[in-house]
């Protein structure tokens, strides 16, 4: 008779434990139910990127001294720097500079180690094209500043995202 009572007690304890676990999961689900949605309607709404966002690289041709530091620090040797040595002044003259954003991993090493600060990261992240060869930007394309999301009147920017309470 006692084994039957202990089995009944164990069964009751297991039932209470299972109900508690189910209740904990249900409480977590309910705590997520009252949060605001995180999804945005992308083409019409855009998030304003943070100050340290690593987007498309901007290049200033006049500042570059063709030292090729950007090529040396790049993990994939990506920037293509063509230069010519001017014998009369014994300095390098930059002829062409290009970066293929189809290969770039946006690590930011080239921007960080550039001695003349001719490279900078922009907030532009919409680089998709139908042809991957269009992602190879030369110094003219790299020199264009992107249109700021804030200045575009057709897009509603989302400044303050709801904070996630933990």
From Swiss-Prot:
It catalyses: a plastoquinone + NADH + (n+1) H(+)(in) = a plastoquinol + NAD(+) + n H(+)(out); a plastoquinone + NADPH + (n+1) H(+)(in) = a plastoquinol + NADP(+) + n H(+)(out). Keywords: 4Fe-4S, Chloroplast, Iron, Iron-sulfur, Membrane, Metal-binding, NAD, NADP, Plastid, Plastoquinone, Quinone, Repeat, Thylakoid, Translocase. GO terms for biological process: photosynthesis, light reaction. One of its GO terms (cellular component) is chloroplast thylakoid membrane. Its EC number is 7.1.1.-. Its cofactor is [4Fe-4S] cluster. NDH is composed of at least 16 different subunits, 5 of which are encoded in the nucleus. This is NAD(P)H-quinone oxidoreductase subunit I, chloroplastic. It comes from Laphamia lindheimeri.
